[in-house]
Amino acid sequence: MSTRRQAIQGGDTIKNPATKFLSWKSNDKCFSYYDKEIAESLKGQPAETISKKANVKVNLPFRFLFLDQLQSVKGWSDALSGQIISNEVKTVSDQELNVVCYHKNAKGEPTKTTIAKGLYSQIKDAVVSAGAKYHKSVYVMLEDGSLANLQFKGACVKEWSEFFNRSKKRLADEWVIVESAKDGKKGAVKFTTPEFKFERSISDSES
């Protein structure tokens, strides 16, 4: 099993630090990730079938050790039928984002189109209108020692940020656990967010 120190330094997975990219599924009240190996094994089947089977739910409780957090924007462009992503930065207030959409051109060839470039405050309107949202990108170590990336957006950003800000001094030494979901409501829209708590201190062998 990897230790927290090895995970921060890259360990055996330095070429591809995160093995899973997880996001919170509000309706299901759990995390999920897209399994590329499952998707590859289903090649040739309808896209809806692949999407349903390759999106793997991770039931609660969910435990992790915090490693680092960055910020980015991600989303989907209906106009270009492609994925919008940006570079990850420590702070969007003073570091530029380069927001790009990866899609296919009229000939069906893979290409990319720049959506916007600059500080988030300067490009926010262009980014949102293109179909992307602000994300908090949190790198963690899972119970099996593998590295994962938690991608928070919307209400999940607020929930994580509040937990981080009030307890960041403890994050280096304790396991975080999500055992349940918190119900929320904005206008007529109901949603859930993960409820973060500390479970236990890390052992000497895990540090």
Where are each of the predicted segments found?
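Short His-Asn-centered micro-motif
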Residues: 142, 152-153, 178-179
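Beta-strand/loop nucleic-acid-binding surfaces
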Residues: 146-167
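Long, compositionally biased interface segments
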Residues: 161-207
